[in-house]
């Protein structure tokens, strides 16, 4: 399992729909896949929200991210063993939301239950870590040929903007958009769904004025 394999899967889905290109949006690993799909010529525009992959093969920041996910392995094991009962443990909400939201209250009970269920049934977790360890991150960003929007999250503990934005800002062509969202963590759709929706739709409307007109 790798970002390339995930991009292959999305390409097959696009082919099944009969879509040569589309406006592609992704968060975290999904942001990495979004830029990979752009490199393959499948994007009309690309929006990466707290995107992963912002490193070279030997960047210290890459190993920092991998170390964070390895450190989270015990929590993953508890979720796998206990399932929803893991949420009854002391500090479970705090620990479960650290990589996701700025505050523990940023995720609802229903959403947190879904997160625990996903974590308990994710066989690709360690496969992705191994692939990330041996492979470079996003390459050829300087050749990005469509409008691109990088959205960073101020309270992101997984890829903090202060250390993880440089690969994008240095590599993407002039004219790309960079937005920093205040007060949200790595998965801002939980804490600020309205703001994220507005960011996505307004960017697409700018790229394609006829969308707004219709």
Curated annotation (Swiss-Prot):
Function comment: Catalyzes the hydrolysis of epoxide-containing substrates. In vitro, catalyzes the hydrolysis of the synthetic compounds PHOME and styrene oxide. Plays an essential role in subverting phagosomal acidification. Plays a major role in the survival of M.tuberculosis (Mtb) during in vitro acidic stress and protects Mtb in response to phagosomal acidification inside macrophages. Also supports Mtb growth under the nutrient-deprived condition at pH 7.0.
PANTHER family: ALPHA_BETA-HYDROLASES SUPERFAMILY PROTEIN, HYDROLASE
Regulation: Inhibited by AUDA, a known epoxide hydrolase inhibitor.
GO molecular function: hydrolase activity
Record-listed E.C. numbers: 3.3.2.10
Keyword entries, A-Z: Hydrolase
Catalytic activity: an epoxide + H2O = an ethanediol
Active site location: 28 (nucleophile), 156 (charge relay system), 186 (charge relay system)
Induction: Expression is up-regulated during acid stress.
Name of the protein described by the UniProt record: Epoxide hydrolase EphH
Family to which this protein belongs: Belongs to the AB hydrolase superfamily.
Effects seen without this gene: Knockdown mutant shows increased reactive oxygen species (ROS) generation in acidic stress and nutrient depleted conditions.
Keyword Hydrolase: yes
Pfam name, any one: Abhydrolase_6
């Amino acid at each position: 399992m790798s970002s390339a394999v995930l991009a292959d899967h999305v390409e097959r889905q696009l082919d099944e729909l009969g879509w040569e290109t589309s406006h592609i949006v992704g968060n975290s690993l999904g942001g990495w896949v979004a830029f990979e799909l752009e490199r393959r010529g499948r994007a009309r525009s690309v929006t990466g929200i707290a995107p992963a992959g912002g490193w070279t093969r030997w960047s210290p920041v890459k190993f920092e991210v991998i170390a964070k996910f390895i450190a989270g392995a015990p929590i993953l094991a508890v979720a796998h063993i206990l399932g929803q009962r893991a949420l009854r443990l002391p500090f479970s909400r705090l620990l479960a939301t650290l990589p996701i939201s700025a505050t523990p209250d940023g995720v609802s009970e229903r959403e947190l239950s879904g997160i625990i269920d996903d974590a308990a049934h994710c066989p690709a977790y360690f496969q992705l870590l191994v692939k990330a360890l041996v492979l470079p991150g996003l390459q050829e960003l300087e050749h990005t040929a469509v409008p691109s929007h990088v959205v960073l999250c101020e309270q992101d503990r997984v890829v903090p903007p202060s250390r993880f934005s440089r690969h994008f800002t240095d590599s993407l062509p002039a004219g790309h958009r960079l937005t920093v969202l205040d007060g949200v963590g790595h998965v801002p759709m939980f804490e600020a769904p309205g703001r994220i929706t507005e960011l996505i739709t307004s960017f697409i409307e700018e790229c394609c004025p006829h969308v707004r007109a219709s």
